[in-house]
């Protein structure tokens, strides 16, 4: 142990170990802060979509994973947050993907009550062109609010299209692809929910398994 080279090697190894541990701690703390912030943002969005006066449960605690590529636009399992009152389901907020946006996937979430009425829609993530396709963001435009109160009468309800295609929804000047993809994605999610309510509400609450 009196060999200087051995001592220096041990000191370097100890220093490296301490640095690695410090980096791991900092990374974990950063991850926890990011996760907490994301959770707060999600809570805010869920409360925008599903009014607090119609449910008495914590939405993020009652979450199930749905998997249906045709309806949700992805092969991945997507979270769905169930609102209940006195233990009975009253509404749901489902995440879905519009896979055919102008610049790729658009991630959105749609709130629907058990009568099939849309309570609200919000955009969670997208890469659409600033100044054109980004009007799907509430902070840029109130376009997404046009879904509120809508009911899908049938799977091929012609009203659920942009006006250019004969429907009720405005298209954007110079950007028809984005709203067309968005309307189709919301329509698919709403139809899926209205046709599979009982099945969805009977699924296990398993969203934590996805995040572990």
UniProtKB/Swiss-Prot annotation:
Its membrane topology: Single-pass membrane protein
Keyword match Phosphoprotein: yes
Location (main, coarse): membrane
Gene Ontology CC annotations of this record: oxidoreductase complex; plasma membrane
Lineage: superkingdom: Bacteria
A single MF term (Gene Ontology): oxidoreductase activity, acting on NAD(P)H
Modification FMN phosphoryl threonine occurs at: 176
Enzyme class: translocase
Protein's GO biological process: electron transport chain
Official protein name in the record: Ion-translocating oxidoreductase complex subunit G
Species lineage: Bacteria, Pseudomonadati, Pseudomonadota, Gammaproteobacteria, Alteromonadales
């Amino acid at each position: 142990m009196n060999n200087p080279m051995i001592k220096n090697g041990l000191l370097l190894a100890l220093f490296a170990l301490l640095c690695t541990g410090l980096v791991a701690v900092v990374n974990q703390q950063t991850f926890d802060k990011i996760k907490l912030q994301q959770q707060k943002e999600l809570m805010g969005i869920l409360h925008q979509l599903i009014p607090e006066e119609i449910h008495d449960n914590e939405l993020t605690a009652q979450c199930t994973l749905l998997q249906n590529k045709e309806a949700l636009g992805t092969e991945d399992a997507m979270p769905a947050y169930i609102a209940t009152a006195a233990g009975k389901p009253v509404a749901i907020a489902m995440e879905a993907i519009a896979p055919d946006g102008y610049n790729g996937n658009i991630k959105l979430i749609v709130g629907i009550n058990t009568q099939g009425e849309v309570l609200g829609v919000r955009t969670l993530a997208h890469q659409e062109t600033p100044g054109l396709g980004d009007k799907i963001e509430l902070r840029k435009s109130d376009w997404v609010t046009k879904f509120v109160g809508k009911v899908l009468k049938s799977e091929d309800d012609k009203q659920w299209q942009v006006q250019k295609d004969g429907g009720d929804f405005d298209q954007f000047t110079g950007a028809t692809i984005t709203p067309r993809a968005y309307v189709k994605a919301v329509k698919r999610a709403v139809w899926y929910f209205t046709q599979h309510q009982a099945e969805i509400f009977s699924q296990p609450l398993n969203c934590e398994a996805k995040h572990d």
